[in-house]
């Protein structure tokens, strides 16, 4: 994009200070071309808008002790340019920056380095991959919103760089696909040899496990051979014994349950001893002898067991009925006993109140006696017994204490020895 087109399309914002050096850097033009285009644009816009211009003044200033003056460069406003030209010898002025007078935006930096011209003057070629490093002018873009042409060519470079990476990605899957069939070919050979190797590896492992768990495996295998269907009948009889008991039987005293269990065990032992003598066959011994007894009985005589089960059920049902009656009667007895136990405390409390009232009437409230020194002492009744009297009979106890306690009793009570008070307190606490 040319500078003239950018100015016509209002791509350059003059609210900020537009430096000529920026335009030289962006559009790669000579100073004369930029100056001519910019002055022509300002003349067109000047009747409507007022611009604030700055000029670069260059000249020589005389100093003491030197015939040739020093070079002086200064950026000056247009209003002060004539004064500076008069002060300096061989003065030259060039347009440096343009800005709309009274712009709302913050001012941009006045001085900026010109990398493009520095490279040209030093005759140094810039590295192709190096990007432009231009300081930002108060948060604004260095080119004043105008995009340079070389930046457009960057996407093409990146696309060219990405192409070899795509080809490498394509080549990698091809390699992986080529490796997969090789692995698949080798896998059947491994599968063919694997069962033999696994068998050879499994044998020592099994031997080790057998040495550790031989005891448990042997013990587990024997009961499996010995236990047959008749064992279910024995377990069923035990389960029926507990299942057929109603809810009331649980509440029956534990003594009746213990007696029934003992009777059942004794009857089983007697039957087993009778049936052991005629049995000619011998079965292999097992770890659990009690289970063996039940197995022999069930295997030899199944009909007799059924009869015995019927008898047991009848006995259990009769026991359950009696247990229910006993439980109901025991409940009633417990209720009556609890009522009897609750009543005596009430009677005892009433008796205690009557006894206390009698003591209050019979015994005097104050005791008068002579001390060892010959002083007359009146002992007042202890104050700790008053709350009990108030709880039992407040109306009867209060007036007795008020009537019989003279004012002198309080004074005398303080002088009484502690041993005598302790003896009286013990007397009332015991009763």
From Swiss-Prot:
Expressed in ovaries (at the protein level). Expressed in ovaries. Its main location: nucleus. Keywords: DNA damage, DNA repair, DNA replication, Nucleus. Residues 156-171, 278-290, 387-411 have a biased composition (Low complexity). Residues 294-307 have a biased composition (Acidic residues). One of its GO terms (biological process) is double-strand break repair via break-induced replication. Residues 128-431 are annotated as: Disordered. Residues 172-200, 252-271, 308-328, 343-362 have a biased composition (Basic and acidic residues). It is found in: Nucleus; Nucleus, Nucleoplasm. GO terms for molecular function: DNA polymerase processivity factor activity. One of its GO terms (cellular component) is zeta DNA polymerase complex. The keyword DNA damage applies. Accessory component of the DNA polymerase delta complex and possibly the DNA polymerase zeta complex. As a component of the delta complex, participates in high fidelity genome replication, including lagging strand synthesis, DNA recombination and repair. Required to recruit the DNA polymerase delta complex to the nucleus of rapidly dividing embryonic cells, and as a consequence is essential for genome replication during the earliest cell cycles. Increases the efficiency and processivity of DNA synthesis of the DNA polymerases during mitotic DNA replication and repair. Component of both the DNA polymerase delta and DNA polymerase zeta complexes. The DNA polymerase delta complex consists of three subunits: the catalytic subunit PolD1 and two accessory subunits PolD2/Pol31 and PolD3/Pol32. Within the delta complex, interacts with both PolD1 and PolD2. Component of the DNA polymerase zeta complex consisting of four subunits: the catalytic subunit PolZ1 and three accessory subunits PolZ2/Rev7, PolD2/Pol31 and PolD3/Pol32. This is DNA polymerase delta subunit 3. The lineage of its organism: Eukaryota, Metazoa, Ecdysozoa, Arthropoda, Hexapoda.
